[in-house]
């Protein structure tokens, strides 16, 4: 029974379900047909807000992009028929280029290589009628990518050894085109330029390091350079790496250089520097002066202390040699002597003379004493008549033999216990004696080599009463150190006064 009722119930349910879904589908179709016939129905509030924002964004974007197409149009217009290989005004008039330089840093200045480094911003301005335009833009600022499409002056630096153009993060170049055809081209570069240094007054020297530039291919009748009131901006707030020098100012010069291919206008700017004296003074002058004065200590050392005096003298000479070599270590190989070389050379001479003074003193005292090692001689006691006859014979012998003399070195004992050489005048032999005038002349001939010297100087301590000493300068051998203690410092002082007066006022 149930098997017959269940199929009937299922059929009734299916029929009822189909009747319920039918009106809903029909209502949807009617709604769609009404949209097509009578237009869109009102949208929700969210959709209206989104549409308004989209319209405002499109309006703002259009206003911002409005100048960009205009600038692109101007640039494309002026470059469409532009030939960057030809200069402006070719065949009609020369191109006038106005130059401005801004110095970022100066230095270091290498004395050994005779060059200096400078970091500059180099600006050139000229007029190109082909780049004129009529628009609201007063100027167009372009980066370095457009430089290759424009005519640029072929300026080069004549005394540069190395040139570096900065390219981080982009090439440091800028072009500004004005509506009247004026073009401004700016580039940053670092230049290693040569600087001829005249070191004659070193270390009181001053130098002018040039920076010359001109056109490489355009002569004077095609390109003219000029300064705009010689405008040079120098940023001294930066730490310039001049080290041993002080910056004193700038100057400029314009000249025409004749070459086989034409006359070129050359612009030169000079950077004036002067050397700082403190570094060289402590490195060279002070050690040289101290070493020279140290060599004079030997004058206060006893003559018997030969090793001490010799060591001090040799050490002083070698030290001055080392200082002279060290002063030329970082120095160009010039063929002339500088003021510092002259000072060190004079100090070397003073040290050498101090060593030579001891050698002369030692020679006069010990060598002559050893050569004339003989018993001590004393002045014989004679009566007044015998002394008168001796003096008369001495005068006659002196007149006969052209002021001949007899001087014998003997050893005497001084007041301080030291043995010193002494000179005793001997009675010349009588004409009738075996040792007559011929014998006297033969003895004098042996001393002919020292006659001229002893004619003017007496180098022995006790010669009072000698007839041959009259009219001569007597120098006490044992006082030679005393003389040196005064002569050397005084002479060195006057040399320094004269040296610094000449060097500072030259």
From Swiss-Prot:
<keyword id="KW-1003">Cell membrane</keyword>
<dbReference type="GO" id="GO:1904862">
    <property type="term" value="P:inhibitory synapse assembly"/>
</dbReference>
<keyword id="KW-1015">Disulfide bond</keyword>
<dbReference type="Pfam" id="PF02932">
    <property type="entry name" value="Neur_chan_memb"/>
</dbReference>
<feature type="transmembrane region" description="Helical">
    <location>
        <begin position="344"/>
        <end position="364"/>
    </location>
</feature>
<keyword id="KW-0770">Synapse</keyword>
<dbReference type="InterPro" id="IPR006029">
    <property type="entry name" value="Neurotrans-gated_channel_TM"/>
</dbReference>
<keyword id="KW-1133">Transmembrane helix</keyword>
<dbReference type="GO" id="GO:0045211">
    <property type="term" value="C:postsynaptic membrane"/>
</dbReference>
<dbReference type="GO" id="GO:0051932">
    <property type="term" value="P:synaptic transmission, GABAergic"/>
</dbReference>
<dbReference type="GO" id="GO:0098794">
    <property type="term" value="C:postsynapse"/>
</dbReference>
<dbReference type="InterPro" id="IPR036719">
    <property type="entry name" value="Neuro-gated_channel_TM_sf"/>
</dbReference>
<dbReference type="GO" id="GO:0004890">
    <property type="term" value="F:GABA-A receptor activity"/>
</dbReference>
<comment type="similarity">
    <text>Belongs to the ligand-gated ion channel (TC 1.A.9) family. Gamma-aminobutyric acid receptor (TC 1.A.9.5) subfamily. GABRE sub-subfamily.</text>
</comment>
<feature type="transmembrane region" description="Helical">
    <location>
        <begin position="281"/>
        <end position="301"/>
    </location>
</feature>
<keyword id="KW-0868">Chloride</keyword>
<keyword id="KW-0732">Signal</keyword>
<feature type="region of interest" description="Disordered">
    <location>
        <begin position="23"/>
        <end position="66"/>
    </location>
</feature>
<dbReference type="InterPro" id="IPR038050">
    <property type="entry name" value="Neuro_actylchol_rec"/>
</dbReference>
<dbReference type="InterPro" id="IPR006202">
    <property type="entry name" value="Neur_chan_lig-bd"/>
</dbReference>
<dbReference type="Pfam" id="PF02931">
    <property type="entry name" value="Neur_chan_LBD"/>
</dbReference>
<feature type="signal peptide">
    <location>
        <begin position="1"/>
        <end position="22"/>
    </location>
</feature>
<keyword id="KW-0869">Chloride channel</keyword>
<dbReference type="InterPro" id="IPR008099">
    <property type="entry name" value="GABAAe_rcpt"/>
</dbReference>
<feature type="transmembrane region" description="Helical">
    <location>
        <begin position="308"/>
        <end position="327"/>
    </location>
</feature>
<feature type="glycosylation site" description="N-linked (GlcNAc...) asparagine">
    <location>
        <position position="252"/>
    </location>
</feature>
<dbReference type="InterPro" id="IPR018000">
    <property type="entry name" value="Neurotransmitter_ion_chnl_CS"/>
</dbReference>
<feature type="topological domain" description="Extracellular">
    <location>
        <begin position="328"/>
        <end position="343"/>
    </location>
</feature>
<dbReference type="InterPro" id="IPR006028">
    <property type="entry name" value="GABAA/Glycine_rcpt"/>
</dbReference>
<protein>
    <recommendedName>
        <fullName>Gamma-aminobutyric acid receptor subunit epsilon</fullName>
    </recommendedName>
</protein>
<dbReference type="GO" id="GO:0022851">
    <property type="term" value="F:GABA-gated chloride ion channel activity"/>
</dbReference>
<dbReference type="GO" id="GO:1902711">
    <property type="term" value="C:GABA-A receptor complex"/>
</dbReference>
<keyword id="KW-0813">Transport</keyword>
<feature type="topological domain" description="Extracellular">
    <location>
        <begin position="23"/>
        <end position="280"/>
    </location>
</feature>
<feature type="topological domain" description="Cytoplasmic">
    <location>
        <begin position="302"/>
        <end position="307"/>
    </location>
</feature>
<keyword id="KW-0407">Ion channel</keyword>
<feature type="transmembrane region" description="Helical">
    <location>
        <begin position="486"/>
        <end position="506"/>
    </location>
</feature>
<feature type="glycosylation site" description="N-linked (GlcNAc...) asparagine">
    <location>
        <position position="134"/>
    </location>
</feature>
<dbReference type="GO" id="GO:2001226">
    <property type="term" value="P:negative regulation of chloride transport"/>
</dbReference>
<keyword id="KW-0325">Glycoprotein</keyword>
<keyword id="KW-0406">Ion transport</keyword>
<feature type="topological domain" description="Cytoplasmic">
    <location>
        <begin position="365"/>
        <end position="485"/>
    </location>
</feature>
């Amino acid at each position: 029974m149930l098997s017959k009722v269940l199929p009937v119930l299922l059929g009734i349910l299916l029929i009822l379900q189909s009747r319920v879904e039918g009106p809903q589908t029909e209502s949807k179709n009617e709604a769609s047909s009404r949209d097509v016939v009578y237009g869109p129905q009102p949208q929700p509030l969210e959709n209206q807000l989104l549409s308004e924002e989209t319209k405002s964004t499109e309006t703002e974007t259009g206003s911002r992009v409005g100048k960009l197409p205009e600038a692109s149009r101007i640039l494309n217009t002026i470059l469409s028929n532009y030939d960057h290989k030809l200069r402006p005004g070719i065949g009609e008039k020369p191109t006038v280029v106005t130059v401005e330089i801004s110095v970022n840093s100066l230095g270091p200045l290498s004395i050994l290589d005779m060059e200096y480094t400078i970091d500059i911003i180099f600006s050139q301005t000229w007029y190109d009628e082909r780049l004129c335009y009529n628009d609201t833009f007063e100027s167009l600022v372009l980066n370095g990518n457009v430089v290759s499409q424009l005519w640029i002056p072929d300026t080069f630096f004549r005394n540069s050894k190395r040139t570096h153009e900065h390219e981080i993060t982009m090439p440091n170049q800028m072009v500004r085109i004005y509506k009247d055809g004026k073009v401004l081209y700016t580039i940053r570069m670092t230049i290693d330029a040569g600087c001829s240094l005249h070191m004659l007054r070193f270390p009181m020297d001053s130098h002018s390091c040039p920076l010359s530039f001109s056109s490489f291919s355009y002569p004077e009748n095609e390109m003219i350079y000029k300064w705009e009131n010689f405008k040079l901006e120098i940023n001294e707030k930066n730490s310039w790496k001049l080290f041993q020098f002080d910056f004193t100012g700038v100057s400029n010069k314009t000249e025409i250089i004749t070459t086989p291919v034409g006359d070129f206008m050359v612009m030169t700017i000079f950077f004036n520097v002067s050397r700082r004296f403190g570094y060289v003074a402590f490195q060279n002058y002070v050690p040289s002066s101290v070493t020279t004065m140290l060599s004079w200590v030997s004058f206060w050392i006893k003559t018997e202390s030969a090793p001490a005096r010799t060591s001090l003298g040799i050490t002083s000479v070698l030290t001055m040699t080392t200082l002279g070599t060290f002063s030329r270590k970082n120095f160009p190989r010039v063929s002339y002597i500088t003021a510092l070389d002259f000072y060190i050379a004079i100090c070397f001479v003073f040290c050498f003379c101090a060593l030579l003074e001891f050698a002369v003193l030692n020679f006069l005292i010990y060598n002559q004493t050893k050569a004339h090692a003989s018993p001590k001689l004393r002045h014989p006691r004679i009566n007044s008549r015998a002394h008168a006859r001796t003096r008369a014979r001495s005068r006659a012998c002196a007149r006969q033999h052209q002021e001949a003399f007899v001087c014998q070195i003997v050893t005497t004992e001084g007041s301080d216990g030291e043995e010193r050489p002494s000179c005793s005048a001997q009675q010349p032999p009588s004409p009738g004696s075996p040792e007559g005038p011929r014998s006297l002349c033969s003895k004098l001939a042996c001393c002919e080599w020292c006659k001229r010297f002893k004619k003017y100087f007496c180098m022995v301590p006790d010669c009072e009463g000698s007839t041959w000493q009259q009219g001569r300068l007597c120098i006490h051998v044992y006082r030679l150190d005393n003389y040196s203690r005064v002569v050397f410092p005084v002479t060195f002082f006057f040399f320094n006064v004269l040296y610094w007066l000449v060097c500072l006022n030259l």
